[in-house]
């Protein structure tokens, strides 16, 4: 029977995902087989496992920290928002259906057997399971039939670490207020409090910590400093989107309302000479060196949004001067047309940006697969991409085909009927269904080198390393920091064997 510990937060973005990843890394370094678990994740970023199953990328990141292969049992329920009131519901890696929030709220209790089955499967492997909650356990409107916070903690008898974010202010009110809103049974599960993202001299917190421990009757297990660790963390998205630093090379990523899988650009963010900006207006777009159109959970809706706010016209104008690269939903937008006969998204027919000679038809069935190989021959300014190795995955609703009898440049040799490699217009515009195509850094290096040559600047090649190697160093940094600022003896003392109600 595996031992368990759970990390819950006072709010979203409190740093739960990082802390779970850090604990996974520490337990792994200490010789344990460890695995992450999150019963239900709501996220725009997802990943495809070796088995072709879909799961949240936060648990993939945590699995990497634990040194194990991502498995869908680490995240049995994934919700991918499709609009402001509903999500695509994915259970055990496969799409169940789209549901409005109210319908899912009533339905979710039927998924408890799936959660228990996934957790028990994980127990077959792990000595320790580190569980991540979602949002706050004190959301009164969500506590009924809870399956992700205290409901899950009760389900597997997990002790809880409660995390508050001091960077946004009011951390003592966050922690004490959350404890006050818990039932006695729930509060008894909370074994330690963590103050996260602190900047400055810890001693100034001493009066507040003393009051918190006296009134909350729960010890403070650690005060963790703000960490500039570059990992694929759902909790850091706001900071990432708002980041506006200046670099020698300026990359603009269109931030449409339903942006997804923007982890494709993480490799560029590690490069000191590169600035990655997420833009949602024409004024923010300015004149970058390259524009990326990322994935989308509502391709037609996001294209309409671009059309209405002027970004489509601005990107089309820039495509005459600089590279424009679309991935997955962004790739579909760049084509001649998008049809949705089955009402997967908006329904009907829509003209695309008409920058690539493809037509897309959206379908209910989702393509989910890992893929690897070499980028096929492409012309244009990024022709040096030809032959670059990639290891990535496809995850999309719909199929694309050439809209003319043009030469199938970029079609993969073993799947010539599907445009699953990289295609171009022969000049500045490129598209691909492949997520993670830049993660090996070879393709990323081609893009950065092209821009550097064009601008007549030098870039530090040593900064363009394997993204995998880069992440390994980040996980070790994260673990080192937590060892220094958390009472790990106390954390080990909290671990207990999972039991089922």
From Swiss-Prot:
Protein name: Cobyric acid synthase
GO molecular function: ABC-type vitamin B12 transporter activity; catalytic activity
Source species, domain of life: Bacteria
Keywords assigned by UniProt, alphabetized: Cobalamin biosynthesis, Glutamine amidotransferase
GO biological process: one example: cobalamin biosynthetic process
Residues in GATase cobBQ-type domain copies: 248-443
Catalytic residue list: 328 (nucleophile), 435
InterPro entries membership: Class_I_gatase-like, CobQ/CobB/MinD/ParA_Nub-bd_dom, CobQ_GATase1, CobQ_N, CobQ_synth, GATase_3, P-loop_NTPase
High-level lineage: Bacteria, Bacillati, Bacillota, Clostridia, Lachnospirales
Family: Belongs to the CobB/CobQ family. CobQ subfamily.
PANTHER family associated with the record: COBYRIC ACID SYNTHASE (PTHR21343:SF1), DETHIOBIOTIN SYNTHETASE (PTHR21343)
Species assigned in the record: Agathobacter rectalis (strain ATCC 33656 / DSM 3377 / JCM 17463 / KCTC 5835 / VPI 0990)
Pathway annotation from the record: Cofactor biosynthesis; adenosylcobalamin biosynthesis
Protein's job: Catalyzes amidations at positions B, D, E, and G on adenosylcobyrinic A,C-diamide. NH(2) groups are provided by glutamine, and one molecule of ATP is hydrogenolyzed for each amidation.
Signal peptide segment: none
